Amino acid sequence: MASASLLKTSPVLDNPEFLKGQTLRIPSVAGVRFTPSGSSSLTVRASSYADELVKTAKTVASPGRGILAMDESNATCGKRLASIGLENTEANRQAYRTLLISAPGLGQYVSGAILFEETLYQSTTDGKKMVDVLIEQGIVPGIKVDKGWLPLPGSNDESWCQGLDGLACRSAAYYQQGARFAKWRTVVSIPNGPSALAVKEAAWGLARYAAITQDNGLDPILEPEIMLDGEHGIDRTFRVAQQVWAEVFFNLAENNVLLEGSSLKPSMVGPGALSARKGPPEQVADYPLKLLHRRRGPVVPGIMVLSGGQSEVEATLNLNAMNQSPNPWHVSFSYARALQNTCLKTWVEGQENVKAQDFACAKSNSLAQLGKYTGEGESEERKKDMFVKATLTY
């Protein structure tokens, strides 16, 4: 966790308006600022990988393609395997991951795949390196680098994301193994505030992660997930998302992160999962686009939205709605369950069925990225809600 002395004062969260209605009051942290004498100009840090970082970001943001998130921890993967009666063994994880990445033609619709560390170093059941299979399909390999969440002392029962220790060495090793982008997922809970401390911690961690991974050749995906837990409406989600992203970009600037060599992975802005007020795709699309226009210019090549537990069809319809009018960014998907759920269910019917479903789900979201998805002919299985209340591990 970032120490209090490292957390800069923020023009966003130090505004008392943000603290209204919260049970926890966080005093402003006195940040040390150095003002050079005489005239000066801001120099944005650019590592020796700058050109490659920009190229990677643009490749991931190529038209009609998005990200397959298959970075579940071994424990979470075990829960998914258990749902179809399989044991959580390395052999079963290897077999399932092999099926996910080996669907013929998958690279037409998937530009990047986020891997768990085991997968990055794993071979397929045919003995080929997973990374090589992806590259042959034109899919950029990525890696999850955070180490999960722990309780955040002094907060409203909120969490902080660990993993900065040793990140530089790990990033360098992942690059050598073939990874070209990274993912760091931190979470913000609306029912618990969110407190100013939790938002500052999330933003600072994301910024430090981004700077470290860029220095080692990995394009950072920035994912401050606004959790779906709660009964709040969409306007409450929107207000919190604005505060979170403002704080994130403030800290990215403080850490001289090269935005052209990064990607954003925002939550779709919708009501809480327990809210009775569910909006149509057009409304769910309008709020995140409004947020992005207010908080981020077009310098970031790709906006890869996460599904956050929505059903496969709902997530695809919402993405399609976001692409009904021109955007200054590539707005696409970075889905895990929304791409995998039906594939997993069909595994018991045969391996080829998994590949077919994998291809079909990716194609549907490719159409949504192009604004051409209709939702016609989708199975009832793909329409099932997949919300699961957040825990401190994943």
From Swiss-Prot:
UniProt catalytic activity: beta-D-fructose 1,6-bisphosphate = D-glyceraldehyde 3-phosphate + dihydroxyacetone phosphate
Subcellular location: Plastid, Chloroplast
Cellular compartments per GO CC: chloroplast; cytosol; protein-containing complex
Residues annotated as transit peptide in the record: 1-46
Keyword Chloroplast: yes
Binding site for substrate: R93, K183
GO biological process entries: fructose 1,6-bisphosphate metabolic process; glycolytic process
CDD domains xref list: FBP_aldolase_I_a (cd00948)
EC numbers: 4.1.2.13
Alphabetically ordered keywords of this record: Chloroplast, Glycolysis, Lyase, Plastid, Schiff base, Transit peptide
Keyword Lyase: yes
Taxonomic superkingdom: Eukaryota
Single Gene Ontology MF annotation: fructose-bisphosphate aldolase activity
Active site positions, chain numbering: E223, K265
Site (Necessary for preference for fructose 1,6-bisphosphate over fructose 1-phosphate): Y394
Pathway membership, UniProt: Carbohydrate degradation; glycolysis; D-glyceraldehyde 3-phosphate and glycerone phosphate from D-glucose: step 4/4
Gene3D superfamilies cross-referenced by the UniProt entry: Aldolase class I
Uppermost EC category: lyase
Primary location group: plastid
Listed NCBIfam families: FrucBisAld_I
Family: Belongs to the class I fructose-bisphosphate aldolase family.
Listed name of the protein: Fructose-bisphosphate aldolase, chloroplastic
